[in-house]
């Protein structure tokens, strides 16, 4: 199905005419050569009548049209599909050409970038990669001459004589190998991709088990996503990898290929069924096992890694102890045993039992590097009944490790003792609870949320630091933690790790070479916090019982139900053991390991701060906030929780009688290592006072008695109102006090349930608008005195010329150059008072020494006296002024002599008698909304009157024959 792409179309089309001409010439020459052969043949008419002639079709000009060549890398030969990506081509092949999927699907070569079907790939590997992998050393030819090639140890031809080569597929993650490609692939599905298939694994119900479906599917499993029913667990894993996860290329990359040299006479006794007597050595000791070269080159990815061993005697084969996993499968599946043995030419080994064949326990290991995990093996037919029985009866084969110093292969159980005894290694324990071990070659860092290979894991852990298991000190160098362990904890053994720790064999160069075995304890998902607490309590109890001095233990009754549960759990940890498995978080899609019933609940509470519940209206499974107990909708996501926590009012509140929620590093799990809100320490008295006053100080404002904060307006009662009302209060506060201190901003934010940044930005924006208005609109600064009171002053006064304004007639009067919202009625005066005629107070004498002289036609108004005396105003009506004269708006007059002072003596003549009485008028306030005459009036009313303004009417006076006045309030 794979077709090579066509490139360089321009060059091809240029040469097409030439190629056609050449082909036509070649065809014409061919016809001329053979035309002479057919001249002698003269068929009869009967022969012509018996023949059938086909009509030639007419020439179609559309055939000469240039075709659309596919320049992409992966092209389908059965249809016009082409793609740059192998995954898209594979999906197309699976969906469109499903019937040819298994036989003609492309597979990636594990040695190079070649892709082809199964048969073509095997031919490609045999032709191009097989000679490069056959590395021999010390192999002697039939006549005793060493066999070699120009490059040293490469053999380009198969060995002659009594030896032959067998192709073997092996797993790059472990030591498993077999001659069949599918067997190795099923092994990878079963052993290395269980974590991928677990979220999709579902068990059939009791009805399906009792029905006829159970006969076809004896395993009783199905896919949760598409309800696919496989025949085996490996088929389910393959289904998940190929159809749901689309990571089949990873399985192909994990399968390696190599060749094994096998003697031809090895398989004859076993194929004929001749029993092998235990304890008797064969007569041909060098012909009854697989001889492997000393230099083995195994590909890892697209590179070749070769492990060079020490010197050995030429011509002597090397014997290798093969792991049980490579030859004898587990007791659950006996069918694979014959395949594993038959993969090396031992086809009749399926009937071997524990009394007829065994593996030799005295074989030496093949020296290999620690990075090479596929060890070549030597099968021997020797005795050791016990070893054979143990190898065949074990339900799970053990893992093997290669010593990095002596390059020998050992079981995992005996490797630690070998390294400590033979190489005088010092054991140093450390902790890295932020590392979660996935399998032997991959781990996950919970801090960085990334997967790390085994070769770079130690360097990454040193970046975060390794902790001492005794004193929990953190070190970023191996030498320092080794020195710390020798000095501070020389005789302390420490707690034994519950799981399999990460082992690093190191050689430190501190003066003399020193071998160190670093044992790093990682996070164990199978160990729950309750089980860890119970184990720690049991360990402490055992240590106390070992002490010679008796320990007096006081027993008390549990106060609450939780204490009783904790005590019962510590007393019977076995009964509280829960089923351990894997589950998937529906919010962040994190794979959770641990007790199935508690892992998801702990993760949702610690990471997302929610609890599972049932929606009261929708009747669907949803979540509720652990702070305010608000219920989310059923279509919520993780971002919805984040937005809610920003505005949640119950985050900083702690209900009475309950413990505060700690969202720190409660456990070393993956969910608890994410960033969360930090709860304040309840032991702090200031913070405890803040929690008690959380109704008015929700953002954490604490009062300081030595620094009291007095606000210009009282914000009490505005915290529960709408956002617009709270913003309006801030605007009114700005009009009273535009430059608040930092403590005032904090108190306002805490009282109004606003962020401090919002309050500060609100004041800053209004200040910036005021500065812009001063620059662009050029407003007038009002004087701070009452003009009506000023008109009664009896001494001379001098004003700047900029303080005067000119009064026009009614029909010529206009508005000042200020904003329209300021040109309203005066502040603090009712409409009836403004529109009515007000008499002018003239005092007791008819001729007073007044500083101003009123002009005819000007309206006189009463003036509020700001004095401590209780004197009252006597208002005398002016007969020369009409009662309905409208108040004119002032207009600014530009003075021609700027900077000069205008000093005029204005005389105010009054033609009314002093003995005339006038009604008493009380003092008026300028701004009733912000008046501070009484404590009750100091609070802001909350609204602005439509009649409020910043201008008040001023009296009109005559200066040098002109009608002038003063701006004032």
Curated annotation (Swiss-Prot):
Polar residues bias spans: 929-946
Disulfide bonds: none
Principal subcellular localization: nucleus
GO biological processes: erythrocyte maturation; regulation of gene expression; regulation of neurogenesis; Wnt signaling pathway
PROSITE patterns: ZINC_FINGER_C2H2_1 (PS00028), ZINC_FINGER_C2H2_2 (PS50157)
Zn finger limits (C2H2-type): 74-97, 107-129, 169-192, 221-244, 401-423, 443-464, 466-489, 583-608, 623-647
GO CC term (a single one): cytoplasm
Function: May be involved in transcriptional regulation. Positively modulates wnt-beta-catenin/ctnnb1 signaling. Required for embryonic neurogenesis. Required for progression through late erythroid differentiation.
The protein's name in its UniProt record: Activity-dependent neuroprotective protein a
Biological source species: Danio rerio (Zebrafish)
């Amino acid at each position: 199905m794979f077709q090579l792409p066509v490139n360089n179309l321009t060059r091809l089309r240029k040469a097409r005419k030439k190629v056609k001409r050449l082909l036509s010439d070649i065809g014409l020459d061919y016809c001329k050569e053979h035309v002479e052969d057919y001249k002698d043949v003269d068929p009869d008419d009967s022969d012509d009548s018996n023949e059938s002639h086909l009509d030639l079709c007419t020439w179609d000009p559309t055939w000469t049209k240039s075709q659309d060549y596919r320049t992409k890398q992966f092209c389908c030969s059965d249809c016009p599909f082409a793609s740059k990506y192998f995954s898209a081509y594979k999906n197309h092949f699976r969906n469109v050409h499903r019937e040819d999927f298994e036989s003609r699907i492309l597979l990636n070569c594990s040695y190079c970038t070649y892709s082809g079907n199964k048969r073509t790939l095997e031919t490609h590997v045999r032709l191009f990669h097989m000679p490069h992998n056959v590395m021999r050393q010390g192999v002697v030819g039939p006549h005793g001459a060493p066999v070699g090639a120009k490059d040293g140890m490469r053999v380009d031809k198969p060995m002659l004589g009594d030896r032959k080569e067998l192709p073997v597929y092996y797993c790059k993650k472990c030591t498993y190998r077999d001659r069949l490609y599918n067997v190795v692939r099923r092994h990878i599905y079963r052993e290395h991709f269980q974590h991928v298939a677990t979220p999709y694994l579902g068990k059939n119900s009791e009805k399906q088990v009792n029905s006829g479906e159970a006969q076809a599917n004896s395993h009783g499993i199905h896919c949760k996503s598409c309800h696919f029913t496989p025949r085996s667990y490996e088929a389910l894993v393959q289904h998940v990898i190929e159809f749901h996860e689309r990571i089949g290329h990873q399985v192909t990359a994990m399968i390696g290929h190599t060749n094994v040299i096998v003697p031809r006479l090895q398989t004859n006794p076993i194929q004929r069924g001749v029993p092998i007597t235990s304890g008797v050595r064969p007569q041909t000791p060098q012909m009854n096992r697989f001889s492997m070269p000393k230099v083995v080159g195994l590909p890892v990815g697209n590179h070749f890694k070769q492990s060079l061993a020490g010197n050995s005697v030429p011509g002597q084969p090397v014997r290798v102890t093969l792991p049980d996993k490579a030859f004898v499968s587990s007791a659950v599946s006996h069918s694979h045993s014959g395949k594993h043995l038959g993969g090396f030419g031992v086809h009749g080994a399926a009937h071997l039992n524990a009394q007829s064949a065994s593996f030799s326990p005295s074989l030496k290991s093949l020296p290999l590097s620690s990075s090479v995990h596929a060890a070549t093996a030597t099968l021997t037919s020797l005795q050791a009944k016990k070893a054979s029985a143990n190898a065949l009866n074990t339900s799970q084969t053990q893992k093997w490790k290669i010593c990095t110093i002596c390059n020998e292969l050992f079981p995992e159980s005996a490797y630690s003792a070998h390294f400590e005894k033979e190489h005088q290694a010092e054991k140093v324990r450390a902790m890295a609870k932020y590392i979660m071990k996935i399998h032997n070659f991959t781990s996950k860092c919970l801090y960085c949320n990334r997967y790390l290979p085994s070769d770079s894991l130690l360097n990454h852990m040193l970046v975060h630091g390794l902790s001492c298991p005794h004193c929990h000190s953190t070190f970023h160098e191996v030498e320092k933690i080794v020195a710390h362990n020798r000095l501070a904890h020389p005789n302390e053994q420490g707690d034994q790790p519950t799981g399999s720790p990460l082992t690093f064999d190191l050689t430190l160069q501190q003066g003399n070479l020193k071998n160190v075995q670093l044992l790093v304890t990682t996070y164990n998902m199978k160990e729950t916090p309750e089980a860890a607490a119970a184990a720690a309590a049991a360990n402490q109890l055992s240590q106390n019982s070992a002490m010679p001095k008796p320990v007096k233990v006081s027993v008390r009754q549990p106060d609450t139900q939780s204490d009783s549960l904790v005590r019962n759990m510590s007393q019977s940890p076995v009964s509280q053991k829960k089923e351990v498995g894997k589950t998937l978080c529906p919010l962040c899609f994190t794979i959770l390991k641990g007790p199935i019933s508690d892992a998801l609940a702990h993760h949702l509470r610690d990471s997302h701060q929610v609890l599972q519940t049932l929606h009261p209206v929708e009747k669907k499974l949803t979540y509720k906030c652990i702070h305010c107990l608000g219920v989310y909708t059923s279509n919520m996501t993780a971002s919805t929780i984040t937005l809610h926590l920003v505005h949640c009012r119950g985050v900083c509140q702690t209900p009475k009688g309950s413990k505060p929620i700690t969202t720190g590093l409660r456990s070393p799990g993956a969910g608890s290592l994410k960033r969360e809100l930090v709860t304040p320490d309840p032991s702090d008295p200031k913070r405890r006072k803040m929690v008690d006053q959380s109704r008015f100080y929700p953002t954490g404002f604490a009062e300081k008695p030595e620094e009291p904060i007095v606000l210009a307006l009282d914000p009490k009662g505005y915290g529960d109102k709408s956002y617009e009302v709270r913003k309006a209060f801030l605007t009114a506060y700005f009009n009273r006090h535009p430059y608040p201190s930092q403590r005032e901003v904090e108190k306002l934010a805490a009282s109004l349930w606003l962020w401090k940044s919002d309050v500060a930005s609100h004041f800053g924006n209004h200040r910036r608008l005021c500065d812009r208005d001063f620059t662009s609109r050029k407003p007038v600064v009002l004087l701070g005195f009452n003009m009506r009171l000023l008109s009664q002053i009896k001494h001379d006064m001098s004003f700047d010329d900029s303080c005067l304004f000119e009064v026009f007639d009614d029909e010529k009067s206009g508005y000042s150059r200020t904003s329209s919202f300021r040109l309203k009625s005066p502040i603090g005066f009712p409409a009836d008072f403004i529109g009515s005629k007000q008499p002018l107070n003239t005092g007791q004498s008819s001729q007073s020494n007044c500083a101003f002289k009123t002009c005819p036609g000007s309206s006189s108004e009463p003036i509020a006296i700001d004095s401590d005396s209780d004197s009252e105003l006597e208002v005398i009506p002016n007969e020369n002024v009409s009662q309905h004269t409208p108040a004119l708006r002032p207009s600014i007059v530009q003075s021609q002599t700027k900077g000069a002072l205008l000093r005029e003596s204005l005389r105010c003549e009054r033609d009314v008698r002093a003995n005339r009485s006038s009604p008493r008028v009380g003092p008026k306030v300028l701004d009733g909304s912000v008046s501070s005459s009484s404590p009750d009036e100091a609070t802001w009313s909350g609204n602005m009157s439509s009649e409020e303004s910043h201008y008040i009417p001023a009296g009109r006076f005559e200066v040098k024959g002109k009608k002038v006045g003063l701006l004032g309030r």
